[in-house]
A protein has these predicted regions:
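N-terminal Rossmann-like NAD(P)+-binding subdomain of aldehyde/semialdehyde dehydrogenases
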Residues: 1-88, 287-293, 307-315
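Short hydrophobic beta-strand segments
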Residues: 86-90, 114-116, 154, 219, ...
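Conserved small-residue-rich beta-alpha loop and adjacent elements
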Residues: 73-135, 139
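Donor nucleotide-activated moiety binding/catalytic core segment of transferases
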Residues: 76-94, 146-152, 164, 269-284
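Conserved NAD(P)+-binding/catalytic subdomain of aldehyde/semialdehyde dehydrogenases
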Residues: 86, 136-225, 332-346
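Short, acidic/turn-prone active-site loops that include or flank metal/cofactor-
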Residues: 118-121, 181-185, 325-329
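Hydrophobic packing residues within well-ordered alpha-helices of enzyme cores
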Residues: 125-128, 168, 230
């Protein structure tokens, strides 16, 4: 397959996903493609935090990304070559299709993906790979799903938590690699946000139950900010508490805070707690007060190697708008490390 054929195949995936997601958006009881329905049912069983709404949200984003125009604009920025390499990809499983971007980049570069899937997110990507294979019989030359261990690879892209990332570095240190570890995302509020801004922030926090590296786990607030304003905007997401895994985490940390005598604010389904940390437990959102822009920039500088993205109304440079953290573009590389450049520099 040449680049044009690979782009066309991904475009067909995008059209297929978008058509089904449009159906679902119009009527959640719509009958979707049988293969999508089956993969969603399996995914919900695989991961207790996966549910149909969030899965469809992720599929819709990929449906919007995977179109010929986007993919041409994206690939035109790189000197795509046909050097053959096998790229091992170790995927995480915290949110739906979280490792799919690595596959897309590898496929666009004309290299073979040897994928170690997370047991918590297998069915969705397997369905898409099956769909791609139905479009072009040569697709099998570009992907291999491996078992417990990666074999016959020239480079590695691995995503995990801080502990597993350290293990990856030791194991793959002789190979070109991208090793990703835990990162978190933060929001900055100055008190001038609209209701829509705060509604968007709530989505950035609670979508996927706060499990993504782009999920907002910490909010920086101006001193004197009324926390009730935040809690009121959160209310639309009150049903997160109906997920038993989320509820158990929420209750566990609430109990810990009570036993330790920590100060916190509780609305019955989420907790606001003051902390200098940026990575908060599920069900808890950390906050920290700041005095001015100079101080907030200093605070962010200290934590920059642990921050994935920043949401604000242009309070700081390179921040994104409220409500957009869970809809990254194809150019939003995790950890700001250009996967395409990495792949194309392999010798």
């Amino acid at each position: 397959m040449d680049l044009k054929e690979r782009i066309n195949a991904l475009n067909n995936v995008g059209v297929f996903l978008k058509n089904n997601c449009d159906k679902y958006a119009q009527n959640k009881d719509s009958i979707l493609d049988k293969e999508i329905e089956n993969s969603i049912k399996k995914a919900v069983i695989e991961n207790q935090y996966f549910e149909k709404d969030n899965i469809m949200y992720a599929l819709r984003n990929w449906g919007n990304i995977l179109n010929t125009k986007n993919l041409n604009l994206f690939t035109n920025k790189y000197p795509i070559n046909q050097k053959n390499h096998n790229v091992g990809i170790i995927m995480a499983g915290n949110i739906p299709l979280v490792g799919f971007h690595d596959f897309v980049c590898t496929f666009l570069c004309g290299k073979k993906s040897i994928i170690k899937q997370s047991k918590k997110d297998k069915s969705l990507s397997e369905f898409i790979f099956k769909f791609l294979n139905s479009l072009n019989e040569d697709f099998h030359n570009y992907i291999e799903i491996c078992g417990e261990r990666l074999k016959n690879f020239d480079a590695v892209i691995a995503t995990g938590n801080d502990f597993s990332a350290n293990q990856f570095r030791k194991y793959f240190n002789k190979f070109p690699n991208i090793i990703r570890q835990s990162r978190h995302s933060v929001a900055i509020i100055d008190g001038n946000e609209s209701k829509d801004d705060l509604k968007g922030l709530s989505s950035d926090i609670f979508r996927h139950y706060g499990l993504g590296c782009r999920s907002i786990s910490k909010i920086y607030l101006p001193k004197g900010y009324n926390l009730d304003v935040l809690f009121n905007s959160f209310y639309e997401w009150k049903n997160v508490i109906n997920n038993s895994a989320y509820y158990n985490n929420y209750l566990y940390y609430k109990t810990i805070y009570l036993m330790k005598g920590d100060k916190f604010y509780d609305n019955g389904f989420s907790i606001l707690k003051e902390s200098e940390k940026i990575g908060s437990p599920i069900g808890t959102i950390f906050f920290e007060y700041y005095n001015d822009k100079t101080e907030i920039n200093s605070l962010l500088k200290i934590k920059e190697d642990k921050i994935q993205c920043i949401v604000s109304n242009e309070i700081v440079k390179n921040s994104i708008v409220f409500g957009s953290s869970q809809t990254p573009s194809i150019e939003d590389f995790a950890d700001k490390e250009d996967t395409m450049n990495f792949l194309l520099k392999l010798s």
